[in-house]
Protein backbone atom coordinates (compact mmCIF):
# COMPACT_ATOMS: atom_id res chain seq x y z
CA UNK A 1 0.00 0.00 0.00
CA UNK A 2 1.53 3.31 -1.07
CA UNK A 3 1.26 6.12 1.44
CA UNK A 4 1.17 9.76 0.40
CA UNK A 5 1.08 13.04 2.32
CA UNK A 6 -0.41 16.32 1.21
CA UNK A 7 2.25 18.95 0.46
CA UNK A 8 0.90 22.22 1.92
CA UNK A 9 3.55 24.28 0.11
CA UNK A 10 2.13 23.16 -3.24
CA UNK A 11 -1.57 22.80 -2.42
CA UNK A 12 -4.48 25.21 -2.01
CA UNK A 13 -7.82 24.70 -0.28
CA UNK A 14 -10.09 27.41 -1.71
CA UNK A 15 -13.80 28.14 -1.50
CA UNK A 16 -16.14 30.63 -3.15
CA UNK A 17 -19.48 31.99 -2.01
CA UNK A 18 -21.84 34.55 -3.51
CA UNK A 19 -22.10 37.88 -1.70
CA UNK A 20 -25.23 40.01 -2.17
CA UNK A 21 -26.09 37.69 -5.08
CA UNK A 22 -23.98 39.81 -7.45
CA UNK A 23 -20.36 39.12 -6.52
CA UNK A 24 -18.16 36.29 -5.31
CA UNK A 25 -15.97 36.16 -2.21
CA UNK A 26 -13.04 33.76 -2.40
CA UNK A 27 -11.34 32.35 0.67
CA UNK A 28 -8.91 29.68 1.65
CA UNK A 29 -7.59 27.67 4.54
CA UNK A 30 -3.87 28.24 5.03
CA UNK A 31 -3.12 25.39 7.49
CA UNK A 32 -4.17 21.87 6.58
CA UNK A 33 -2.92 18.31 6.36
CA UNK A 34 -3.92 15.13 4.65
CA UNK A 35 -2.93 11.58 3.83
CA UNK A 36 -3.74 9.19 1.03
CA UNK A 37 -3.31 5.43 0.96
CA UNK A 38 -3.62 3.66 -2.39
CA UNK A 39 -2.63 0.25 -3.67
CA UNK A 40 -3.35 1.07 -7.33
CA UNK A 41 -1.13 3.51 -9.22
CA UNK A 42 -4.20 5.29 -10.67
CA UNK A 43 -5.52 6.03 -7.12
CA UNK A 44 -8.88 4.38 -7.89
CA UNK A 45 -8.76 2.62 -4.51
CA UNK A 46 -7.53 5.66 -2.56
CA UNK A 47 -8.42 6.18 1.08
CA UNK A 48 -8.15 9.87 1.93
CA UNK A 49 -8.16 11.82 5.17
CA UNK A 50 -7.91 15.59 5.40
CA UNK A 51 -8.30 18.32 7.99
CA UNK A 52 -7.98 22.11 8.03
CA UNK A 53 -7.53 24.55 10.90
CA UNK A 54 -10.51 26.91 11.06
CA UNK A 55 -8.32 29.66 12.55
CA UNK A 56 -6.33 29.68 9.29
CA UNK A 57 -9.31 30.85 7.20
CA UNK A 58 -8.50 33.87 5.03
CA UNK A 59 -10.69 35.93 2.71
CA UNK A 60 -8.24 38.87 2.63
CA UNK A 61 -10.49 40.80 5.02
CA UNK A 62 -9.69 40.58 8.75
CA UNK A 63 -13.15 41.70 9.88
CA UNK A 64 -14.89 39.09 7.71
CA UNK A 65 -12.38 36.41 8.74
CA UNK A 66 -13.10 37.17 12.39
CA UNK A 67 -16.83 36.85 11.74
CA UNK A 68 -16.29 33.50 9.97
CA UNK A 69 -14.37 32.21 13.01
CA UNK A 70 -17.13 33.36 15.40
CA UNK A 71 -20.10 31.30 16.65
CA UNK A 72 -22.18 32.85 13.81
CA UNK A 73 -20.29 30.62 11.36
CA UNK A 74 -17.53 28.07 12.10
CA UNK A 75 -17.18 28.71 15.87
CA UNK A 76 -13.43 28.07 15.78
CA UNK A 77 -13.12 28.11 19.58
CA UNK A 78 -15.52 25.16 19.95
CA UNK A 79 -14.76 23.43 16.62
CA UNK A 80 -11.13 24.18 15.68
CA UNK A 81 -10.96 21.86 12.65
CA UNK A 82 -12.98 20.68 9.70
CA UNK A 83 -12.28 17.21 8.33
CA UNK A 84 -12.97 14.88 5.41
CA UNK A 85 -12.69 11.10 5.21
CA UNK A 86 -13.27 9.31 1.93
CA UNK A 87 -15.58 6.35 1.48
CA UNK A 88 -14.88 5.71 -2.23
CA UNK A 89 -13.01 6.99 -5.28
CA UNK A 90 -14.76 5.90 -8.48
CA UNK A 91 -13.13 6.24 -11.87
CA UNK A 92 -15.48 7.90 -14.40
CA UNK A 93 -13.12 8.31 -17.35
CA UNK A 94 -9.55 9.10 -18.30
CA UNK A 95 -8.09 10.71 -15.19
CA UNK A 96 -11.59 11.70 -13.95
CA UNK A 97 -13.04 10.41 -10.68
CA UNK A 98 -15.90 10.97 -8.26
CA UNK A 99 -14.71 11.12 -4.67
CA UNK A 100 -17.31 10.32 -2.02
CA UNK A 101 -16.83 10.81 1.67
CA UNK A 102 -17.90 12.43 4.89
CA UNK A 103 -17.17 16.07 5.67
CA UNK A 104 -17.34 17.23 9.27
CA UNK A 105 -17.79 20.94 9.94
CA UNK A 106 -18.83 22.38 13.28
CA UNK A 107 -19.32 18.89 14.67
CA UNK A 108 -21.81 17.98 11.93
CA UNK A 109 -20.92 15.11 9.59
CA UNK A 110 -22.50 14.95 6.12
CA UNK A 111 -21.88 12.89 2.99
CA UNK A 112 -20.51 14.84 0.03
CA UNK A 113 -19.21 14.02 -3.43
CA UNK A 114 -16.41 15.83 -5.21
CA UNK A 115 -15.17 15.79 -8.79
CA UNK A 116 -11.49 14.88 -9.13
CA UNK A 117 -9.06 15.24 -12.02
CA UNK A 118 -5.85 13.24 -11.60
CA UNK A 119 -3.08 15.20 -13.31
CA UNK A 120 -0.51 12.41 -13.11
CA UNK A 121 2.50 11.34 -11.11
CA UNK A 122 6.08 12.48 -11.75
CA UNK A 123 9.50 12.17 -10.14
CA UNK A 124 10.01 15.34 -8.10
CA UNK A 125 13.06 16.60 -6.26
CA UNK A 126 12.30 14.41 -3.24
CA UNK A 127 10.60 11.41 -4.87
CA UNK A 128 7.24 10.70 -6.46
CA UNK A 129 4.70 13.53 -6.62
CA UNK A 130 1.04 13.26 -7.70
CA UNK A 131 -1.25 16.15 -8.63
CA UNK A 132 -5.03 16.54 -8.41
CA UNK A 133 -7.68 19.18 -9.01
CA UNK A 134 -10.83 18.78 -6.92
CA UNK A 135 -14.08 20.68 -7.24
CA UNK A 136 -17.48 20.43 -5.65
CA UNK A 137 -20.31 22.19 -3.87
CA UNK A 138 -21.87 22.00 -0.46
CA UNK A 139 -24.70 23.72 1.33
CA UNK A 140 -23.26 25.55 4.34
CA UNK A 141 -26.57 25.28 6.24
CA UNK A 142 -26.24 21.48 6.19
CA UNK A 143 -23.28 21.97 8.54
CA UNK A 144 -24.86 24.48 10.90
CA UNK A 145 -23.42 27.59 9.21
CA UNK A 146 -26.75 29.39 9.31
CA UNK A 147 -25.97 33.10 9.81
CA UNK A 148 -27.36 35.40 7.16
CA UNK A 149 -28.95 38.78 6.83
CA UNK A 150 -31.32 40.38 4.36
CA UNK A 151 -30.60 43.47 2.32
CA UNK A 152 -33.07 46.35 2.10
CA UNK A 153 -34.49 44.77 -1.06
CA UNK A 154 -34.90 41.34 0.56
CA UNK A 155 -31.82 39.67 -0.95
CA UNK A 156 -29.48 37.55 1.13
CA UNK A 157 -26.01 38.72 2.10
CA UNK A 158 -24.35 35.28 1.82
CA UNK A 159 -25.51 32.42 -0.41
CA UNK A 160 -26.01 28.95 1.05
CA UNK A 161 -24.02 27.28 -1.74
CA UNK A 162 -20.27 27.09 -1.24
CA UNK A 163 -18.10 26.06 -4.19
CA UNK A 164 -14.88 24.20 -3.44
CA UNK A 165 -11.81 24.60 -5.65
CA UNK A 166 -8.88 22.56 -4.41
CA UNK A 167 -5.45 21.98 -5.91
CA UNK A 168 -3.46 19.19 -4.28
CA UNK A 169 0.06 17.93 -4.64
CA UNK A 170 0.90 14.71 -2.82
CA UNK A 171 4.35 13.43 -1.92
CA UNK A 172 4.99 9.73 -1.51
CA UNK A 173 5.66 9.16 2.17
CA UNK A 174 9.05 7.90 3.26
CA UNK A 175 8.07 4.38 4.36
CA UNK A 176 11.28 3.87 6.35
CA UNK A 177 10.61 7.06 8.33
CA UNK A 178 7.01 5.94 8.98
CA UNK A 179 8.19 2.53 10.27
CA UNK A 180 10.69 4.23 12.61
CA UNK A 181 7.94 6.23 14.32
List each language-model region with its residue ranges.
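Low-complexity, acidic/polar, glycine-enriched regions of mature
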Residues: 1-181
Amino acid sequence: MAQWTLDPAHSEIRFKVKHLVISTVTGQFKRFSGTVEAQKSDFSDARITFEADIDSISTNNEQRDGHLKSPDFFDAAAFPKLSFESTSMTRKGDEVYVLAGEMTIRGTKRKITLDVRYNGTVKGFDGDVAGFEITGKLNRRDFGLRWNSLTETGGVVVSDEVRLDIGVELKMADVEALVAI
